[in-house]
């Protein structure tokens, strides 16, 4: 139990360091490449969502929840991301307070760390095919 506690403490220290702001990220930029980004740096005010952005070879660090709709996740890796929420098409657009919403964004060769993913049902099923060990939690109306 003590070793497990030490491991979790070390992980937290590491993630805090990696996610600290060493450079200024402009959340209004259209393209991000080769950046280490604390997910909170991408949050926009008043429930606005990120739209039509491209992320290439970025490391996106939580803790955070990211809803990715109408986008693309290609050749990306997920570390300590836990379960994935799958949104049924019958729900329509959901208002997810505290969640960073990405609409029509592309994530190419990125690393997600400590980030909960919320995906449309089709995207979640594709993710499950590529990563069978992933647990998908379905959200329906």
Predicted regions located by residue number:
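N-terminal segments that cap or nucleate solenoid repeat domains
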Residues: 2-65
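Solvent-exposed loop/turn tips at the surfaces of repeat/solenoid architectures
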Residues: 30, 35, 40, 53, ...
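Surface-exposed loop/turn motifs in large extracellular/passenger domains
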Residues: 44-51, 67, 80, 92-106
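Long terminal segments
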Residues: 94-141
């Amino acid at each position: 139990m003590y070793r497990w506690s030490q491991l979790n403490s070390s992980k937290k220290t590491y993630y805090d360091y990696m996610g600290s702001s060493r450079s200024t990220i402009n959340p209004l930029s259209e393209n991000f490449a080769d950046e280490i980004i604390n997910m909170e740096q991408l949050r926009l005010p008043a429930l606005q969502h990120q739209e039509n952005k491209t992320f290439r070879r970025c490391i996106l660090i939580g803790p955070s929840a990211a809803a990715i709709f109408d986008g693309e996740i290609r050749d990306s890796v997920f570390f300590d991301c836990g379960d994935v929420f799958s949104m049924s098409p019958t729900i329509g657009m959901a208002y997810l307070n505290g969640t960073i919403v990405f609409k029509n964004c592309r994530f190419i060769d990125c690393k997600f760390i400590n980030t909960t993913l919320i995906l449309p049902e089709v995207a979640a099923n594709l993710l499950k095919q590529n990563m069978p060990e992933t647990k998908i939690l379905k959200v329906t109306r």
